[in-house]
Design a protein with these regions (language model features):
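Bacterial N-terminal signal peptides that target proteins for export
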Residues: 1-10
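C-terminal motif of bacterial Sec signal peptides marking the signal peptidase cleavage site
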Residues: 17-19
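Short, conserved catalytic or interaction motifs in soluble domains
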Residues: 22
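A structural "domain/chain start" motif
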Residues: 25-136, 140-153, 157-193, 197-268, ...
């Protein structure tokens, strides 16, 4: 099972849907595809309308984000905090495909192949909204740090230590991971940096899912180390990843080959969310570097979108396949409320890390 969050509108175009279309919505709108021995179906679940979702209260409680490790107290204690880079990654496509072959009833001398796939994309969010959330998230972290009594570097100070850091052109990059040719899941996303804390190459999740990930991480660690050396404080480079859908796929080939793929709209803080930190340990030469990783995906139970889906079956008893295309149509005001709940919870978890190392903070 894969869980994720993302916007096709980021790429400036909604998902194109063909065939017979049914529009549905609700707390968990679902699109599924199933291929069995001799039939295939595509379905979409129902629930709340866009009007009902838009009428929900504007604020949402911060999501309970947690990390799987902690910043060492020797690095976090009694240091000025610098946040030279802050990124938000928006998942905008999630696809799943199941392939199953054979089975005792699969045919004479070789069996048959069944496949089911679901392709999803997030729509309904204006491009400028994504940038606004990134800017808000960065400002919120600084505000939470100051409210906790932690000294925070000014924008000028943070910019000065990052003057030689390799910035990402356009303060944005696109990424993808996974594949579905032989079954499995794939994810696409776009990462934007806060305008006051632009993305630094190697600290922004580029290369994730590919062979360049290791090289990007090496460059990012070197950049973080240089910034920490220059600052004399604690450098933080947060990366928040937001998802919009859960996708899953499964297949079996016991009696008859079957394949299933499903997508359910759900907002969440997704894996890939992390904080790179660096600071010089007392008595040591170069600065130490580490990463806080998200302990687990953090979903919200609140509805934020409807779903439009189309699909059907194709093939015959020796090779049946189904495919569903689904657009998760976000209600922007509700999505924004959940995005704010996500960054507030993420930032609160960062602040808690520092407070734990500073008993008086």
């Amino acid at each position: 099972m894969a869980r994720a969050t993302t916007p096709i509108i980021l790429l400036a175009a909604p998902l194109l849907l063909g065939g017979c279309m049914a529009t549905t919505g609700g707390p968990a709108p679902t699109a599924g595809a199933q291929a069995g021995f001799a039939s295939g179906v595509a379905t979409a679940g129902g629930g709340l309308s866009a009007t009902q979702i838009a009428a929900m209260p504007g604020e949402a409680a911060p999501l309970p984000v947690g990390f799987s490790s902690a910043i060492p107290a020797s690095l976090a204690a009694a240091r000025k905090v610098f946040v030279p880079a802050y990124g938000v990654s928006y998942i905008h496509t999630q696809n799943a495909r199941a392939v199953s072959q054979g089975g005792l009833m699969g045919g004479f001398g070789g069996g048959s192949t069944r496949s089911a796939s679901v392709r999803t994309g997030l729509t309904g969010i204006a491009p400028e909204t994504f940038q606004r959330i990134a800017d808000e998230a960065h400002a919120d972290l600084l505000a939470q740090l100051r409210a906790a009594g932690i000294e925070v570097a000014t924008a000028e100070e943070a910019g000065a230590i990052a003057a030689s850091a390799p910035r990402i052109a356009g303060n944005a990059h696109d990424g993808s991971a996974g594949g579905t040719m032989l079954g499995g899941q794939s994810t696409g996303w776009r990462t934007l940096g806060a305008q006051a804390a632009p993305l630094v190459s190697g600290l922004s999740g580029e290369g994730a899912g590919g062979g360049l990930a290791g090289l990007a991480a090496i460059g990012g660690n070197q950049a973080a180390q240089r910034m920490a050396d220059a600052s004399g404080g604690l450098v933080l480079a947060p990366l928040l990843r937001l998802d919009y859908v859960n996708v899953s796929s499964s297949g079996r080939s016991l009696l008859a080959a079957t394949a299933n793929a499903e997508a359910t709209a759900q907002f969440s803080v997704a894996p890939g969310t992390a904080v790179t930190y660096a600071a010089r340990r007392q008595g040591m030469g170069a600065s130490d570097i580490g990463t806080l990783q998200l302990a687990a995906s953090v979903p919200s139970a609140e509805p934020f979108a409807t779903m439009a889906a189309s699909g059907g079956a194709a093939g015959n008893w020796v090779g049946l396949g189904t495919r569903t295309d689904a657009a998760v149509q976000a209600v922007e005001a509700r999505w924004v409320a959940l995005a704010r709940a996500a960054y507030r919870g993420f930032n609160a978890a960062i602040v808690q890390q520092l407070r734990a190392a500073r008993p008086t903070a």
